[in-house]
């Protein structure tokens, strides 16, 4: 059976602001099943942003597990991420999940990979999913050459990814944190 897959999620941090956005397309093989999926969420009293890419059911499972760890550790992002990946590496069911998360709070942006890794990206920017490389390239160019706010960079990066990646559409959800 084919998996639901593909998306673009991008996170940009500039100054005391962070923006996380994603497109709304869900595909099954070469068929668009839904164009308005919401892959960006606010967690832990609206203090943490999370975006997911990968097999849809796996991504929801991973996000729910992360949210439980976040609650357990009173919103401490790094600790929750490390605890989740520890479980991910030791739990047989979790090890088979085909999904990735980008999570961000006021201080940190983290990528949680399908291998159970916790990565803190450089340049205040991260992108995952089938259009992630396009979005990351666009965002990096905008970060280096403009003074645009992070939410504008996320929007423009998603637009570029949507123009290039057949698994990414132009229906965007963008959330922000910070002043």
From Swiss-Prot:
It comes from the Bacteria. The keyword Metal-binding applies. GO terms for molecular function: metal ion binding; threonine-type endopeptidase activity. Allosterically activated by HslU binding. PROSITE patterns: PROTEASOME_BETA_2. It is found in: Cytoplasm. GO terms for cellular component: HslUV protease complex; proteasome core complex. A double ring-shaped homohexamer of HslV is capped on each side by a ring-shaped HslU homohexamer. The assembly of the HslU/HslV complex is dependent on binding of ATP. Belongs to the peptidase T1B family. HslV subfamily. This is ATP-dependent protease subunit HslV.
